[in-house]
Regions:
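N-terminal beta-strand motif that seeds the catalytic metal site of vicinal oxygen chelate
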Residues: 1-17, 73-80, 133-150
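Vicinal oxygen chelate
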Residues: 3-12, 43-46, 66-91, 115
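Core segments of cupin and vicinal oxygen chelate
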Residues: 8-51, 88, 94-97, 102-110, ...
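Structural preference for solvent-exposed beta-strand-turn elements
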Residues: 26, 105-112, 121, 128-131, ...
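Short, charged/polar, Gly/Pro-enriched secondary-structure boundary elements
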Residues: 50-53, 122-125
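Short, conserved beta-strand edge motifs with alternating hydrophobic and charged residues
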Residues: 54-56, 79
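Short, conserved turn/kink motifs that form compact alpha/beta structural patches or helix kinks used as
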Residues: 58-61
Length: 150
């Protein structure tokens, strides 16, 4: 397992994109997409030799994420990429992690399955077994493109 990204919950995804780009020199690598299952807007940001950042903004009736943001938002989860999602879920459950969201299509990952687990100390874990990102506008290996779409 290796870290794919870390995720931050924000109130306004476009403002957050501007902030991460101007302060931390990240680049938007995917268009903002609407994830109807998780009821969030999603985008990924990248920076050479750094970890990928995922930003999520609550949409629709996502009351739990809206409540999270009222309390300040911020760090939401760490995502690990594994070789076999079902097998890794079973392994982590045997080690005491609690399954929060069973495998379901993740629109931010071109509908490949994702799952969420809860580790000790309230750490939310997302699991994926794909490299695909929906709405790719900037390859994570290519930097300096100005053709962003928000």
């Amino acid at each position: 397992m290796e870290i794919d990204h870390i995720c931050f919950s924000v109130n306004n995804i476009n403002d957050a994109i501007d902030y991460w780009e101007s302060i931390f020199e990240y680049k938007q690598m995917t268009a903002v997409i609407e994830n109807s299952l998780q009821k969030v807007k999603v985008t990924f940001l990248s920076k050479e030799n750094s970890i990928t950042i995922k930003l999520i903004e609550p949409s629709g009736n996502n009351n739990s994420l809206k409540s999270f943001n009222i309390r300040g938002g911020g760090f939401h989860h760490v995502c690990f990429k594994c070789d076999d999602l079902s097998q890794k879920i079973n392994e982590l459950r045997e080690k005491g992690l609690k399954l929060l969201v069973p495998p379901q299509p993740g629109e931010a990952f071109n509908n490949n399955n994702i799952a969420f687990l809860l580790a000790k100390n309230g750490l939310n874990i997302e699991l994926i077994d794909t490299d695909e990102k929906a709405g790719l506008i900037l390859n994570s290996l290519t930097f300096g493109l100005d053709d962003k779409k928000k």
